[in-house]
Amino acid sequence: MSAKTLYDKLWESHVVHTEQDGGVLLYIDRQLLHEVTSPQAFSGLRAAGRKAWRIDANIATADHNVPTTDRAAGIADATSRLQVDTLDRNCAEFGIEEFGMHDKRQGIVHVIAPEQGLTLPGMTVVCGDSHTATHGALGALAFGIGTTEVEHVLATQCLWARKSRSMRIWVEGELGNGVTAKDLVLAIIGRIGTAGGTGYAIEFAGPAVHALSVEGRMTLCNMAIEAGARSGMVGVDAVTIDYLRGRPYAPVGKIWDQAVAVWGELHSDPDAQFDAEIRLEATDVAPQVTWGTSPEMVVDISARVPDPALEKDPVRRKGWSDALAYMDLAAATPISSIALDKVFIGSCTNARIEDLRAAAAVARGHHKAASVKAVLVVPGSGLVKAQAEAEGLDRIFRDAGFEWREPGCSMCLAMNADRLEPGERCASTSNRNFEGRQGAGGRTHLVSPAMAAAAAIAGHFVDVRDWIMH
């Protein structure tokens, strides 16, 4: 039998039917639903007189529109309130379990599914959200889909799809102190570009990747999308198994033992061939900061803003010039001199307990700079919030002048009350720095949680490695 990649194994085990043109009917093990991309899907079921085919394979939560301040006051914005209320009604009508706004398990969909054991190795996982790739960190095939496809999965638990090409990104060595999975994935995107992974399913592998926790691996897979890929994944190892053991929806007893035996095979075979392969040295990676309006516009903290005049490619040169104009930055500006108005620590990229611990370790005993208007710390779920409070992290943040919020997508995107005002500059642990992503006219710089906390205290970007040493 020929050697197979992890992607091959996951794909082939879910093929229901293959058409002559290469189209594949793929079985979907888990669908995750939220309030933004599901309403029309439920309406389609209702109009056709259909029920959900497998109620137990679908689970929902509200995350994009929920307020991160006083939940008891409800949702002020009428459109946001309608979306959340509609999700509640649809889930009740179709019998789908929902972690509602006042459920202690509620949170960002890509945080709650792994922490609940709803995402398991070997699964196919879909959601009407591009960052569904996050779940690949557990050895799953996970990807975002459109609203019409959400309806198809509700109705049939299957989906028409075409197989991607395979890419392996191998990271040798060990990340240095103060350098995180977020820095690694930003460095990868800086190298291959936001189109580098287009048409591929990316497997992250190598000693540096398998030295990461599952939460760090989720950060890598989460931003595979920003590299242009359809999905990202990491092979199963003992770290994966230990993470899942005892999760509420994970198997138990003999079924757990059987599952672990199967999961142990979910890695690429030693001789497996990939369509493309990229290799990096972890020791070469430093803390990263984006300077422009695309995740690929990123440099080390010690660098300066690039000069478009030095770029030979005319398309890239114009893109850089436009980005600098929007970001109100001059070429050759030291990254460390860029002052900030706000800081956001949260999102499906970096709002798990390890992320909050990293930020709190930097913030402990300090206070935000007077020039920084606000620092929002938004846990990824109610359970992450409770764990952080049990560890006293909330007190560290409050003592530092940071705001401790309720779980939700928050300032990752301007779809709720947490947003930037025109011209405001933000250090953000989220995944996208597009124009207007955090609010019309807002300027976003992507960083790790530790880098964000250090910037909040200094009032500008600093090398968190120096901060940790002192």
Curated annotation (Swiss-Prot):
Residues that coordinate or bind [4Fe-4S] cluster: 348, 409, 412
Domain of life: Bacteria
Catalytic activity, EC: 4.2.1.33
Record key words, sorted: 4Fe-4S, Amino-acid biosynthesis, Branched-chain amino acid biosynthesis, Iron, Iron-sulfur, Leucine biosynthesis, Lyase, Metal-binding
A biological process from GO: L-leucine biosynthetic process
Reaction(s) this enzyme catalyzes, per UniProt: (2R,3S)-3-isopropylmalate = (2S)-2-isopropylmalate
Coiled-coil region list: none
Requisite cofactors: [4Fe-4S] cluster
Gene3D superfamilies attached to this UniProt entry: Aconitase, domain 3
Top-level EC class: lyase
Pathway membership: Amino-acid biosynthesis; L-leucine biosynthesis; L-leucine from 3-methyl-2-oxobutanoate: step 2/4
Listed GO MF terms: 3-isopropylmalate dehydratase activity; 4 iron, 4 sulfur cluster binding; metal ion binding
UniProt entry tagged with the keyword Metal-binding: yes
CDD domains, alphabetized: IPMI
Record flagged with keyword NAD: no
Co-factor binding comment: Binds 1 [4Fe-4S] cluster per subunit.
Subunit structure as annotated in this protein's UniProt entry: Heterodimer of LeuC and LeuD.
Summary of the function given for this chain in its UniProt record: Catalyzes the isomerization between 2-isopropylmalate and 3-isopropylmalate, via the formation of 2-isopropylmaleate.
Family recorded in the similarity comment: Belongs to the aconitase/IPM isomerase family. LeuC type 1 subfamily.
Protein name in UniProt: 3-isopropylmalate dehydratase large subunit
Species, as recorded: Acidithiobacillus ferrooxidans (strain ATCC 23270 / DSM 14882 / CIP 104768 / NCIMB 8455) (Ferrobacillus ferrooxidans (strain ATCC 23270))
The organism's taxonomic lineage, starting at the top: Bacteria, Pseudomonadati, Pseudomonadota, Acidithiobacillia, Acidithiobacillales
Gene name linked to the record: leuC
